[in-house]
């Protein structure tokens, strides 16, 4: 009787004499990205701190003022080479332009010289999903993340003068936020 009881205990403790072994393999993958990138706006490729200065408009001739180019560059903290790997964590990168009052239906709002001058700002990169005039209704430009990770977005700005423009100086501002999703 003692033998049968001991055998039964061993049988139950070992799982009925049947042993199961399973190998499970779990693979994790992740993108490691820099968490902080900083922005530099180069005006006319001169590193002009994001300030564009347009030529003089002569109302008597009505000739347009030549456009000016500017580039938005992104750098990872401490880097001297442009690029922002943080975009690789998303699927689309977006530059969203304009705080309240900076854009209207005609473009970037300016003050001075009659207050009717607008600045037509457009993305020029082929990878931009929108290359029309930035306005209050169309103020976002999206890019593929592989392009955005290179850290360079190019734009062109051109002032548009109304017929009743007055002599004087004008100025405007356009802010933007860079995001990725």
Curated annotation (Swiss-Prot):
Its main location: other. Coiled coil: none annotated. It is found in: Fimbrium. Residues 1-21 form the signal peptide. Disulfide bonds join 37-84. Keywords: Disulfide bond, Fimbrium, Plasmid, Signal. InterPro entries: Adhesion_dom_fimbrial_sf (IPR036937), Adhesion_dom_sf (IPR008966), K88_fimbrial_pA (IPR016372). One of its GO terms (biological process) is cell adhesion. GO terms for cellular component: pilus. Fimbriae (also called pili), polar filaments radiating from the surface of the bacterium to a length of 0.5-1.5 micrometers and numbering 100-300 per cell, enable bacteria to colonize the epithelium of specific host organs. K88 fimbria, 0.1-1 micrometer in length and 7 nanometers in diameter, is composed of about 100 identical subunits. This is K88 fimbrial protein A. The gene is faeC.
